[in-house]
Amino acid sequence: MAKFIIDAGHGGNDPGAIYNGRKESNDVLRLALRVGELLKKNGQTVLYTRESDKSVSLSERSSFENKNGCDYFVSIHRNAYQPEAAKGVETHIYSNGSSAEQLANKVNLELVNVGFVDRKVKVSNFHVLRETKNPAVLIEVGFIDNSSDNKLFDSKFEDIAQGIARGCLKQEGKELVVSNNTLDDDTYFRVICGSYKDRSNAIKQQNKLRSVGFESFLEVLHNS
C-alpha cells in the first residue's frame, strides 16, 4: 500500500487559468477528488492539499507534503497559453532519473491513450516539485483555453481520472480495479418487468409482483 498526496492546484482567491468563465481551480478539484477516490478504493492511502474551493499557498502545499510524508505527490493542473493555440497533456518533474520520472511517464501515457496530444514529460522548476521531499509530479491535463481539450476533459472525465489513478497504481506494480456495481448516492438502478398495451394486464402483473413481496408502480408512457 502506497501513500499519495493529491494536490488540486489553485483554489479560493486564486482560480488559476480562466477561459470563457471556466476556472482551472474547479476543474482540477473535481478531478483530484475523483482520482483520490479511485486510489482509496484500490487500497491506497490518500491525503489532499485541499478538498474544497479554498486558498492554499505554494509553501503550504509543500509544507503539508513534507510534514505528512508520502510515497508520491501528485499535483493536478490545467494548462493555458493563447485561445485555441495549443493543446495536449504534459507532465512535469524536477529531475530526470527518478521514481517521479517513472510515475510521470506512466500517467502521461495513460492520458495520451484517453485522446490528448502528447506534449511529453518535462523537467521544470515548479515550487511543488522543487520543495517537496518525496517524488512529485505535476500534470497539466489539457489546455483550458482550447475547446477540443475542454470537450475531451468533459466527455472523458472518468477515463481521465481512471488514467491518472491507473498510472499511479502501475508505479506500485498494481492494476486499477473499478467496480461498476454501485453508483453514487443519488443514482439508482430501476428494474422493469414488462410493458403492456392493456391496462388490466399491467395491473394483473403488478398484483402478481406484490403477492410475492415486490412493490411496484404503474407508469403510463406515450410514444412520441
Roles of regions detected by a PLM:
Residues 1-2, 224:
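Short, Lys/Arg-enriched, disordered terminal segments
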Residues 2-4, 22-180:
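Active-site-proximal helix/loop segments of hydrolytic enzymes
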Residues 2-21:
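Short glycine-rich His-centered loop
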Residues 11, 79, 144, 196, ...:
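Active-site beta-loop-alpha junctions enriched in small/polar residues
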Residues 16, 101, 148-149, 201-203:
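Short acidic, gly/pro-rich beta-turn/loop elements at beta-sheet edges
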Residues 17, 54, 190-191:
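Generic anion/oxyanion-binding catalytic loop in active/binding sites
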Residues 18-25, 196-199:
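Periplasmic OmpA-like peptidoglycan-binding domain that tethers envelope proteins to the cell wall
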Residues 177-224:
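Solvent-exposed beta-strand motifs enriched in subsets of small alpha/beta binding domains
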